[in-house]
């Protein structure tokens, strides 16, 4: 094993990378509230794992979506647990994100030179809310259906571009299969990909600039 490690070490300098990660200075004023961002990340990873597991059983069609969710909850092995953890961690992720935003704002973590870190954080907050909107509709029950109808109907009030925007969100003039397909694609592919990219940017900036000092 040592020869294998030495082979990788010679080419990738693994030890230098590990030393850089583990030797980063942590300011003495840091407390438990500075962990809120990390908890949000943990919830996101739980969401990815449990969401991926449910894709094996979920069927994104208006005729089978609700039945597939019922199957997950009643017949699939540990399906009830996986979906419950997914729901709980979703709520926890939103709560931790909100508390994290408040902590950063109240401690002035958005000030120079960390403006871009704040901007990426706001984008992540919007993406988190988008997860909630798109995921809420996937069971395609009465609550999900009417929630989608209301949310996608909001842009209708925008002059000129309102109607085309509504049709873009729904995939047609009314809520139906095209809408569910769009929301499923957003929830399982587009939003996770964007979130991963912006999280990488967010953490890279924090890594480069360090944690902001006390007020």
From Swiss-Prot:
Binding of heme c: at which residues? 35
Keywords annotated in UniProt: Chloroplast, Electron transport, Heme, Iron, Membrane, Metal-binding, Photosynthesis, Plastid, Thylakoid, Transmembrane, Transmembrane helix, Transport
| Residues that, per the record, bind heme b 2 | 86, 187
Q: Which GO terms describe its molecular function?
A: electron transporter, transferring electrons within cytochrome b6/f complex of photosystem II activity; metal ion binding; oxidoreductase activity
Under the heading Pfam families, the entry gives: Cytochrome_B (PF00033)
Main location per UniProt?
plastid
Superkingdom in the source lineage: Eukaryota
An annotated GO cellular component of this protein is:
chloroplast thylakoid membrane
Query: Which subcellular locations apply to this protein?
Result: Plastid, Chloroplast thylakoid membrane
Family in the record? Belongs to the cytochrome b family. PetB subfamily.
What does the miscellaneous comment read?
Heme 1 (or BH or b566) is high-potential and absorbs at about 566 nm, and heme 2 (or BL or b562) is low-potential and absorbs at about 562 nm.
Q: What is the annotated role of this protein in its UniProt record?
A: Component of the cytochrome b6-f complex, which mediates electron transfer between photosystem II (PSII) and photosystem I (PSI), cyclic electron flow around PSI, and state transitions.
What name does UniProt use for this protein?
Answer: Cytochrome b6
Organism from which the protein derives: Nymphaea alba (White water-lily)
């Amino acid at each position: 094993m040592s020869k294998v490690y030495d082979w990788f070490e010679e080419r990738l300098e693994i030890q230098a990378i590990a030393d850089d990660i583990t030797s980063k200075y942590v300011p003495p004023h840091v407390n438990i509230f500075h962990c809120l961002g990390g908890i949000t990340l943990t919830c996101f990873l739980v969401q990815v794992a449990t969401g991926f597991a449910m894709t094996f059983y979920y069927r994104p069609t208006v005729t089978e979506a609700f039945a597939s969710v019922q199957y997950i909850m009643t017949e699939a092995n540990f399906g009830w647990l996986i979906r419950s953890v997914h729901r709980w961690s979703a709520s926890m992720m939103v709560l931790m994100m909100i508390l994290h935003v408040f902590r950063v704002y109240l401690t002035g973590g958005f000030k120079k030179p960390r403006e871009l870190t704040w901007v990426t954080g706001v984008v992540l907050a919007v993406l988190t809310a988008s997860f909630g909107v798109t995921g809420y509709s996937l069971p395609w029950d009465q609550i999900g259906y009417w929630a989608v109808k209301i949310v996608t109907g909001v842009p209708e009030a925008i002059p000129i571009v309102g109607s085309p925007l509504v049709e873009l969100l729904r995939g047609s003039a009314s809520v139906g299969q095209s809408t569910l397909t769009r929301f499923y694609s957003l929830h399982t592919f587009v939003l996770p990909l964007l979130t991963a990219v912006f999280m990488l940017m967010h953490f890279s900036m924090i890594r480069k600039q360090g944690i902001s000092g006390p007020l």
